[in-house]
């Protein structure tokens, strides 16, 4: 067990453009990408925003192909991947767990569909090892 201590100060930064919870996030090239999650009254979000800490500004990027939550992001050389998740929840409706896999290209601001997961999953772990994606655990559709 490490006895290392971390000394740092918290600093308030600009709020996200839209209040949300349970979004996915990832740091690429010193910019924070925030995808999906829940907005007003537990409705899934289609938003993708990026925060640049150097300028202190948020920028809205192209909306997701559909509203989504319960995903993880993994980087690659020109963007990031996300897979599975809960789609288009409308309160008090039931979550729709999916098997979709997507790649987002940062330079092109574009999504590309990839082959589906073998089954519907949400909230699991996603990792990229070499050129392969690995999805671990997660909730399964009823």
Give the residues covered by each predicted segment.
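Kelch-like beta-propeller repeat domains
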Residues: 1-142
